[in-house]
């Protein structure tokens, strides 16, 4: 846990952006010098809760609570229209993500922005985590503030991002009002994991994703789950970039990198969503398919640093589709071994599940 503590401190103490006057804004750099990643702020808040929960280090929390609040308050300031959702700086409108810019989230080559489902789910967990930390310190007013932020976000999330036509969540709703739904398993599943989707709708959503996998003939569960089961529109991808589609239907690069490629680590959320709704059998079906591949060491192929050489992403037939080769994220799905146990799932996700 000292490494976790050091990592949190590195980001919240040394990677906060300053405005023209030199004042800290609360926004954190994501990687290199890239800013405007909403999840860059949510992640350290969640990690701080993990650290304190695991260690009971209240002295550290007392020293860092002000920094954590500044990080969270930046997120609250990004609810620019007051609906409860955290709006990204990026519009998410088609054809607006151009080099050298990046999107608002881990999926940095996908043109997600404005009201983004992935980052808002993480912000929801982050607010709940910080509220719990404030409660541990007896800071009632602050706990109420972050609880209210989480409540507002939850109230707006499903009505804003649910697609009644498909029964799935859209990945993001762009500034022009368009809901961008590409049948994205991780996006739907993460929201289910965190209780942002009503139970009946959650079960139906998972059913629909299985149906969609059958429709598109995806069978390689040993690899994990594709990013999306419907090809991305060319304007929904960073241009120009590795994996960027050129054909109007997006099929020319479908299955490559972030246009429907497979990043094994994110399969955690799809597996865990089944455990969350009581469908252990289908969650285990994916986990048990992936474990032998992990045992053989096939979710990494060493440092590559070359497009189409890294096994950190694969195509639907298991060919390399990434560029890093070794990516620690890839092994995140192993957490599902713990998440299948109700008591451990509640322990890890207590702020969002209680």
Where are the language model's segments positioned?
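Acidic/His metal-coordination segments adjacent to aromatic residues that form catalytic metal sites
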Residues: 18-35, 96-115, 176, 248-249, ...
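Acidic, glycine-anchored loop motifs typical of Ca2+
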Residues: 84-86
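Hydrophobic/aromatic-rich effector regions of fungal transcription factors
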Residues: 32-35, 39, 43, 47-54
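Hydrophobic or amphipathic alpha-helical targeting/insertion segments
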Residues: 51-54, 58-60, 70-72
